[in-house]
Curated annotation (Swiss-Prot):
Keyword entries, A-Z: Chaperone, Cytoplasm
Gene Ontology biological-process entries: protein complex oligomerization; protein folding
Main location, first listed in the record: cytoplasm
Species this protein is from: Escherichia coli O8 (strain IAI1)
GO cellular component, one term: cytoplasm
Record-linked InterPro entries: Chaperone_TorD, DMSO/NO3_reduct_chaperone, HscB_C_sf, TorD-like_sf, TorD/DmsD_chaperones
Protein name in UniProt: Chaperone protein TorD
Family that this chain belongs to: Belongs to the TorD/DmsD family. TorD subfamily.
Subcellular location: Cytoplasm
Function: Involved in the biogenesis of TorA. Acts on TorA before the insertion of the molybdenum cofactor and, as a result, probably favors a conformation of the apoenzyme that is competent for acquiring the cofactor.
Gene: torD
Domain of life: Bacteria
Length: 199
């Protein structure tokens, strides 16, 4: 990625972690349709590989703003996609895709982090991977830890996530009838792919 700073990429990961970790509340729903978010989306679109995915997400948000009971509908989508059985869902856990659920724990230890007691999900939840990537990008920008060490851990995390993220995103597209979470997963997929290539 050429135009986004490490801190900006960290913010995108943190934002996506939040959206994949719990249902949107009224405040978040208002925020994603705000002028401030439109500016943020414009910044993301300055990164050519992200432009199409951001446009798709903006289209979903525009449709969402005229949807009756948007928050309740999105909550139902979230529940159906991420909290039900895996028959017609996109479970946000590495272990749901036959991946080693212990890998993220090892990566967190290596980063000097641990999961919060406030987050009542297994450690292999997608949001944990995204929070770790956010932390690593912020650390790159601070310069307090050798960049080579952070970058090595970032690459390990991206590799572990990439083992199952494409299937997760495909399942979001398959089962998210409205498309908001499908669009979010597509943005995440492109972001991770770009980040992984930016060695």
């Amino acid at each position: 990625m050429t135009t986004l700073t490490a801190q900006q990429i960290a913010c995108v990961y943190a934002w996506l972690a939040q959206l994949f970790s719990r249902e949107l509340d009224d405040e978040q729903l208002t925020q994603i349709a705000s002028a401030q978010m439109a500016e943020w989306f414009s910044l993301l679109k300055s990164e050519p590989p992200l432009a199409a995915a951001v446009n798709e997400l903006e289209n979903c948000i525009a449709t969402l703003t005229v949807r009756d009971d948007a928050r309740l509908e999105l909550a139902a989508d979230f529940c159906g996609l991420f909290l039900m059985t895996d028959k017609q869902a996109a479970l946000p856990y590495a272990s749901a895709y036959k991946q080693d659920e212990q890998e993220i724990k090892r990566l967190l230890v290596e980063a000097g982090m641990e999961t919060s007691g406030n987050f009542n999900e297994p450690a292999d939840h997608l949001a944990i991977y995204l929070e770790l990537l956010s932390h690593l990008h912020f650390s790159l920008g601070e310069g307090t830890v050798p960049a080579r060490r952070i970058d090595s851990l970032r690459q390990k995390t991206l590799t572990a996530l990439w083992q199952w993220l494409p299937e997760f995103a495909a399942r979001c597209h398959q089962y998210d009838s409205f498309g908001f979470y499908a669009a979010l997963s597509q943005l995440l997929l492109v972001l991770v792919e770009c980040d992984h290539q930016n060695r």
